[in-house]
Design a protein with these regions (language model features):
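Active-site-adjacent structural elements that line small-molecule/cofactor binding pockets in enzymes
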Residues: 1-308
Length: 308
Protein backbone atom coordinates (compact mmCIF):
# COMPACT_ATOMS: atom_id res chain seq x y z
CA UNK A 1 0.00 0.00 0.00
CA UNK A 2 1.29 3.46 -0.88
CA UNK A 3 2.28 5.69 2.01
CA UNK A 4 -0.48 8.12 2.94
CA UNK A 5 -0.04 11.80 3.69
CA UNK A 6 -2.48 14.26 5.23
CA UNK A 7 -2.70 18.03 5.51
CA UNK A 8 -3.95 19.73 8.66
CA UNK A 9 -5.33 23.25 8.53
CA UNK A 10 -6.25 25.69 11.30
CA UNK A 11 -8.79 27.95 9.61
CA UNK A 12 -8.73 30.68 12.20
CA UNK A 13 -8.01 34.38 11.78
CA UNK A 14 -7.55 35.42 8.17
CA UNK A 15 -9.19 32.39 6.54
CA UNK A 16 -12.34 32.79 4.46
CA UNK A 17 -14.55 29.98 3.17
CA UNK A 18 -13.08 30.45 -0.31
CA UNK A 19 -9.55 30.02 1.13
CA UNK A 20 -10.49 26.75 2.82
CA UNK A 21 -11.87 25.36 -0.41
CA UNK A 22 -8.98 26.62 -2.54
CA UNK A 23 -6.39 25.03 -0.23
CA UNK A 24 -8.40 21.79 -0.18
CA UNK A 25 -8.41 21.62 -3.98
CA UNK A 26 -4.70 22.40 -4.15
CA UNK A 27 -3.88 19.68 -1.61
CA UNK A 28 -5.95 17.12 -3.48
CA UNK A 29 -4.32 18.06 -6.78
CA UNK A 30 -0.89 17.76 -5.13
CA UNK A 31 -1.54 14.13 -4.16
CA UNK A 32 -2.40 14.44 -0.48
CA UNK A 33 -4.63 11.64 0.79
CA UNK A 34 -6.50 13.49 3.53
CA UNK A 35 -7.35 17.01 4.66
CA UNK A 36 -8.14 17.61 8.32
CA UNK A 37 -9.48 20.79 9.92
CA UNK A 38 -8.94 21.90 13.50
CA UNK A 39 -11.74 23.45 15.54
CA UNK A 40 -10.17 26.88 16.16
CA UNK A 41 -12.34 29.96 15.55
CA UNK A 42 -14.60 27.90 13.31
CA UNK A 43 -17.30 25.21 13.32
CA UNK A 44 -15.25 22.20 12.32
CA UNK A 45 -18.24 20.23 11.02
CA UNK A 46 -19.17 23.08 8.69
CA UNK A 47 -15.52 23.36 7.66
CA UNK A 48 -15.47 19.66 6.78
CA UNK A 49 -18.54 20.20 4.61
CA UNK A 50 -16.73 23.00 2.76
CA UNK A 51 -13.70 20.80 2.15
CA UNK A 52 -15.83 17.87 1.04
CA UNK A 53 -17.73 20.01 -1.44
CA UNK A 54 -14.46 21.24 -2.95
CA UNK A 55 -12.85 17.80 -3.35
CA UNK A 56 -13.61 14.46 -4.94
CA UNK A 57 -11.00 11.94 -3.79
CA UNK A 58 -9.35 12.78 -0.47
CA UNK A 59 -10.47 11.75 2.99
CA UNK A 60 -11.81 14.70 4.97
CA UNK A 61 -11.74 14.81 8.74
CA UNK A 62 -12.35 16.84 11.86
CA UNK A 63 -9.15 17.31 13.82
CA UNK A 64 -10.79 17.38 16.29
CA UNK A 65 -14.44 18.15 17.06
CA UNK A 66 -14.74 19.25 20.69
CA UNK A 67 -17.18 16.84 22.36
CA UNK A 68 -18.40 19.47 24.82
CA UNK A 69 -19.74 21.74 22.07
CA UNK A 70 -22.29 19.34 20.51
CA UNK A 71 -24.81 16.90 21.87
CA UNK A 72 -23.78 13.43 20.64
CA UNK A 73 -27.07 13.12 18.76
CA UNK A 74 -26.34 16.33 16.84
CA UNK A 75 -22.78 15.19 16.17
CA UNK A 76 -23.90 11.78 14.90
CA UNK A 77 -26.60 13.16 12.63
CA UNK A 78 -24.26 15.80 11.23
CA UNK A 79 -21.52 13.24 10.64
CA UNK A 80 -23.95 10.89 8.91
CA UNK A 81 -25.10 13.60 6.51
CA UNK A 82 -21.55 14.78 5.75
CA UNK A 83 -20.38 11.20 5.14
CA UNK A 84 -23.32 10.58 2.83
CA UNK A 85 -22.60 13.75 0.85
CA UNK A 86 -18.93 12.73 0.53
CA UNK A 87 -19.79 9.13 -0.33
CA UNK A 88 -17.84 7.70 2.59
CA UNK A 89 -14.78 9.97 2.67
CA UNK A 90 -15.51 11.54 6.06
CA UNK A 91 -13.54 10.80 9.25
CA UNK A 92 -15.00 12.00 12.55
CA UNK A 93 -12.17 13.02 14.86
CA UNK A 94 -13.31 13.62 18.44
CA UNK A 95 -11.58 14.94 21.53
CA UNK A 96 -12.01 16.89 24.73
CA UNK A 97 -10.02 19.97 23.64
CA UNK A 98 -8.25 21.76 26.52
CA UNK A 99 -9.21 23.27 29.88
CA UNK A 100 -8.35 26.89 28.92
CA UNK A 101 -10.50 26.60 25.78
CA UNK A 102 -13.47 25.05 27.52
CA UNK A 103 -13.23 27.35 30.54
CA UNK A 104 -13.41 30.37 28.24
CA UNK A 105 -16.62 28.90 26.80
CA UNK A 106 -18.13 28.23 30.22
CA UNK A 107 -17.81 24.45 29.90
CA UNK A 108 -17.27 22.17 32.91
CA UNK A 109 -15.18 19.27 31.60
CA UNK A 110 -15.79 16.94 34.54
CA UNK A 111 -13.74 13.75 34.05
CA UNK A 112 -12.55 14.11 30.42
CA UNK A 113 -11.73 10.43 29.72
CA UNK A 114 -15.07 9.32 31.16
CA UNK A 115 -16.88 12.00 29.16
CA UNK A 116 -15.05 10.92 26.01
CA UNK A 117 -16.02 7.29 26.58
CA UNK A 118 -19.70 8.17 26.99
CA UNK A 119 -19.65 10.46 23.97
CA UNK A 120 -17.94 8.05 21.55
CA UNK A 121 -20.24 5.24 22.67
CA UNK A 122 -23.34 7.40 22.16
CA UNK A 123 -22.26 8.72 18.76
CA UNK A 124 -21.44 5.25 17.48
CA UNK A 125 -24.78 3.98 18.76
CA UNK A 126 -26.71 6.64 16.82
CA UNK A 127 -24.59 6.06 13.70
CA UNK A 128 -25.64 2.42 13.86
CA UNK A 129 -29.28 3.41 14.22
CA UNK A 130 -29.38 2.04 17.75
CA UNK A 131 -29.55 5.26 19.78
CA UNK A 132 -32.57 6.30 21.85
CA UNK A 133 -35.53 7.01 19.58
CA UNK A 134 -36.71 10.58 19.17
CA UNK A 135 -39.98 11.30 17.38
CA UNK A 136 -38.87 9.15 14.41
CA UNK A 137 -37.27 5.69 14.25
CA UNK A 138 -33.47 5.61 14.05
CA UNK A 139 -31.70 4.17 11.03
CA UNK A 140 -28.06 3.32 10.33
CA UNK A 141 -26.03 5.88 8.43
CA UNK A 142 -25.89 5.08 4.68
CA UNK A 143 -22.09 5.53 4.66
CA UNK A 144 -19.53 4.36 7.24
CA UNK A 145 -18.21 7.02 9.61
CA UNK A 146 -14.85 6.05 11.14
CA UNK A 147 -14.33 7.60 14.56
CA UNK A 148 -10.85 8.75 15.57
CA UNK A 149 -9.99 9.96 19.05
CA UNK A 150 -7.43 12.55 20.15
CA UNK A 151 -5.18 11.25 22.90
CA UNK A 152 -2.54 12.64 25.26
CA UNK A 153 -2.19 10.23 28.18
CA UNK A 154 -1.79 6.45 28.19
CA UNK A 155 -5.34 6.26 29.59
CA UNK A 156 -6.88 8.04 26.61
CA UNK A 157 -4.70 6.11 24.15
CA UNK A 158 -5.98 2.87 25.66
CA UNK A 159 -9.52 4.23 25.38
CA UNK A 160 -8.90 4.98 21.71
CA UNK A 161 -7.72 1.42 21.24
CA UNK A 162 -10.90 0.10 22.84
CA UNK A 163 -13.50 2.32 21.19
CA UNK A 164 -12.17 4.04 18.08
CA UNK A 165 -11.11 3.28 14.53
CA UNK A 166 -8.08 5.52 14.86
CA UNK A 167 -6.35 7.93 17.16
CA UNK A 168 -5.01 11.42 16.58
CA UNK A 169 -2.07 12.50 18.72
CA UNK A 170 -0.53 15.95 18.24
CA UNK A 171 2.89 17.23 19.32
CA UNK A 172 4.08 13.69 19.89
CA UNK A 173 7.62 12.53 19.25
CA UNK A 174 8.30 9.45 17.14
CA UNK A 175 9.53 7.74 20.31
CA UNK A 176 6.17 8.31 22.03
CA UNK A 177 4.32 7.02 18.96
CA UNK A 178 6.36 3.83 19.27
CA UNK A 179 5.57 3.66 22.99
CA UNK A 180 1.85 4.15 22.38
CA UNK A 181 1.44 0.92 20.44
CA UNK A 182 1.42 -1.14 23.64
CA UNK A 183 -1.28 1.11 25.14
CA UNK A 184 -3.34 0.80 21.97
CA UNK A 185 -3.00 -2.96 22.03
CA UNK A 186 -4.25 -3.11 25.62
CA UNK A 187 -7.34 -1.21 24.57
CA UNK A 188 -7.84 -3.25 21.41
CA UNK A 189 -7.91 -6.42 23.46
CA UNK A 190 -11.21 -5.14 24.93
CA UNK A 191 -12.68 -4.01 21.60
CA UNK A 192 -15.50 -5.69 19.73
CA UNK A 193 -15.68 -5.77 15.94
CA UNK A 194 -12.97 -3.20 15.23
CA UNK A 195 -9.99 -3.64 12.92
CA UNK A 196 -6.50 -2.21 13.17
CA UNK A 197 -6.20 1.19 14.83
CA UNK A 198 -5.19 3.87 12.33
CA UNK A 199 -2.48 6.04 13.88
CA UNK A 200 -2.70 9.54 12.41
CA UNK A 201 -0.17 11.86 13.98
CA UNK A 202 -0.42 15.65 13.64
CA UNK A 203 3.08 17.00 12.96
CA UNK A 204 3.88 20.74 12.77
CA UNK A 205 5.93 21.25 9.61
CA UNK A 206 8.17 24.18 8.70
CA UNK A 207 10.18 23.84 5.49
CA UNK A 208 13.12 26.16 4.80
CA UNK A 209 16.85 26.05 4.23
CA UNK A 210 17.75 27.71 7.55
CA UNK A 211 17.01 25.31 10.43
CA UNK A 212 17.46 28.00 13.10
CA UNK A 213 15.02 30.29 11.31
CA UNK A 214 12.42 27.54 11.00
CA UNK A 215 12.74 26.75 14.69
CA UNK A 216 11.90 30.38 15.44
CA UNK A 217 8.86 30.16 13.16
CA UNK A 218 7.83 27.02 15.05
CA UNK A 219 8.22 28.76 18.40
CA UNK A 220 5.96 31.56 17.25
CA UNK A 221 3.32 29.17 15.93
CA UNK A 222 3.36 26.73 18.85
CA UNK A 223 3.77 29.16 21.75
CA UNK A 224 0.05 29.10 22.54
CA UNK A 225 0.16 25.37 23.27
CA UNK A 226 2.78 25.80 26.00
CA UNK A 227 0.10 27.20 28.31
CA UNK A 228 -2.18 24.16 27.96
CA UNK A 229 -1.87 21.76 30.94
CA UNK A 230 -2.53 18.68 28.80
CA UNK A 231 0.42 19.49 26.54
CA UNK A 232 2.60 20.32 29.54
CA UNK A 233 1.79 16.86 30.89
CA UNK A 234 2.55 15.33 27.49
CA UNK A 235 5.91 17.07 27.20
CA UNK A 236 6.92 16.07 30.71
CA UNK A 237 6.00 12.44 30.01
CA UNK A 238 8.02 12.65 26.79
CA UNK A 239 11.21 13.61 28.61
CA UNK A 240 11.05 17.41 28.42
CA UNK A 241 10.74 18.22 32.13
CA UNK A 242 13.03 21.29 32.17
CA UNK A 243 11.10 22.77 29.25
CA UNK A 244 7.80 22.24 31.09
CA UNK A 245 9.20 23.97 34.16
CA UNK A 246 9.73 27.02 31.94
CA UNK A 247 6.24 26.69 30.45
CA UNK A 248 4.71 26.67 33.91
CA UNK A 249 6.55 29.93 34.61
CA UNK A 250 4.95 31.49 31.52
CA UNK A 251 7.95 31.45 29.18
CA UNK A 252 5.77 30.75 26.13
CA UNK A 253 7.54 29.84 22.91
CA UNK A 254 10.95 30.44 24.51
CA UNK A 255 10.37 27.23 26.49
CA UNK A 256 10.37 25.18 23.30
CA UNK A 257 13.96 23.98 23.12
CA UNK A 258 15.69 22.92 19.92
CA UNK A 259 15.60 19.35 21.22
CA UNK A 260 11.84 19.44 21.80
CA UNK A 261 11.07 21.05 18.45
CA UNK A 262 13.26 18.59 16.56
CA UNK A 263 11.39 15.73 18.26
CA UNK A 264 7.82 16.83 17.53
CA UNK A 265 8.16 18.82 14.29
CA UNK A 266 9.46 18.47 10.78
CA UNK A 267 11.64 21.50 10.18
CA UNK A 268 14.48 22.69 8.00
CA UNK A 269 15.38 21.77 4.41
CA UNK A 270 12.93 19.46 2.66
CA UNK A 271 15.43 16.59 2.71
CA UNK A 272 15.71 16.90 6.51
CA UNK A 273 11.93 17.07 6.86
CA UNK A 274 11.57 13.90 4.83
CA UNK A 275 14.08 12.11 7.06
CA UNK A 276 12.15 13.19 10.15
CA UNK A 277 8.91 12.07 8.51
CA UNK A 278 10.43 8.67 7.79
CA UNK A 279 11.22 8.32 11.51
CA UNK A 280 7.56 8.92 12.38
CA UNK A 281 6.48 6.32 9.85
CA UNK A 282 9.02 3.82 11.17
CA UNK A 283 7.64 4.34 14.68
CA UNK A 284 4.17 3.26 13.53
CA UNK A 285 2.48 6.36 12.11
CA UNK A 286 0.01 5.25 9.44
CA UNK A 287 -1.18 8.70 8.37
CA UNK A 288 1.03 11.70 9.14
CA UNK A 289 -1.00 14.92 9.16
CA UNK A 290 1.37 17.77 8.33
CA UNK A 291 0.39 21.04 10.00
CA UNK A 292 1.74 24.17 8.30
CA UNK A 293 2.01 27.70 9.63
CA UNK A 294 -1.42 28.97 10.56
CA UNK A 295 -1.95 31.30 7.61
CA UNK A 296 -3.11 30.49 4.09
CA UNK A 297 0.31 31.15 2.57
CA UNK A 298 1.88 28.67 4.99
CA UNK A 299 -0.54 25.96 3.91
CA UNK A 300 0.11 26.72 0.25
CA UNK A 301 3.90 26.54 0.71
CA UNK A 302 3.68 23.19 2.49
CA UNK A 303 1.47 21.75 -0.24
CA UNK A 304 4.01 22.83 -2.85
CA UNK A 305 6.93 21.32 -0.91
CA UNK A 306 5.29 17.91 -0.44
CA UNK A 307 3.62 17.65 -3.85
CA UNK A 308 3.61 14.03 -5.04
Amino acid sequence: MAERLGLGIIPGVGWRAKDIQAIAREAEDAGFDGIFAAEVNNDVMATAQLIGAATRRVAVGTWIANIYLRHPYVCAQGAALIADAMEGRFILGLGVSHPPVNKALGVDMGDPPAALRRYVTAVRSWLKGEGPATHLPQRPTPQPVPIYVAAVTSRTVELAGELADGFMPFLWSAARVEQSKAWLQRGRAKAKGLGKVDISVGIPTYVGDDVKQQREVARGNLAVFTGFPFFQRLFRASGFGPEVDQMERGAGGAALSDRLLDAVCLLGPLSRCREQLAAFRAAGTDLPILMPSVDVDGARALIKAFRR
